[in-house]
Amino acid sequence: VILLHGFPETSASWSTVADLLATAGIASYAPDQRGYSPGARPTDIADYRLQELVGDIVGLCDEFGLERVHLAGHDWGAIVAWAVAAAHPERVTTLTAVSVPHPAAFAWARENDPDQRERSGYMEFFAKPDEPEQALLADDCVALRLGFGDVVPADAVAEHLRVLTAPGAMTAALNWYRAMDPADQEIADVTVPTTFIWSSGDIAIRRAGVERCGQHVSGPYRYIEIPDGSHWVPEEFPSVVADAITVQIEAYPSGAPLPPR
């Protein structure tokens, strides 16, 4: 299983889920994605377009010699996972998306649902030059710390902030928002077996897009709603996420290596 993190987090957001998967005998890998890893931090905004992020995951599978993988993502990681599954269904056995619905459903909600439109206002702010870096890094990252609240474990918060306070890292992470393009919302429906997990207490993602998510999955689809939890589902409800991934893998096993060349 490849586990993809979102903003403003790192691979550490998946630590407990990965441990639970390992206990179940399932190997996983959680990379620090483009911009978060100092070895993959281009400076051009165009280098953070969705197709580039998708290419990173396909390249990672190639590097590991994996023809097909189980894919899970949270927040921005969910958007990348949806896009990988839509563009490369031959490489994805199952998809588990957490918090963010299919990008087309999310785009519809931002345009048509006043609540979601208001909740998504931060995305426009994050796309501005310079100002969001100043706001998020000010006063020892107090805005980020408040956003995590007491849900995200202290050691994970420390790791996220260690990464994001490195020179150029916050700008690189925010470039994901600056590189957004309307065409990125027009990805195809997903055909692979999919589980979507959402918490009704998520202050960033509201119900309108969630309820349309299944319209964009033509393969087997399972929806799990967690009552009143936060946006930080992998940290707050790791057993729910790990169990959902495990159940889906058991129903649709594969994770095949690439054939010899």
What is the meaning of each model-derived region?
Residues 260-261:
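A short, charged, Gly/Pro-tolerant segment at domain boundaries
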Residues 1-40:
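Conserved HGGG/HGGXW glycine-rich cap/lid loop of the alpha/beta-hydrolase fold
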Residues 10-11, 79, 230:
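A short, glycine- and basic residue-enriched loop/turn
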Residues 29, 36-68, 72, 76-226, ...:
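Flexible "cap/lid" subdomain of the alpha/beta-hydrolase fold that forms the substrate-access gate
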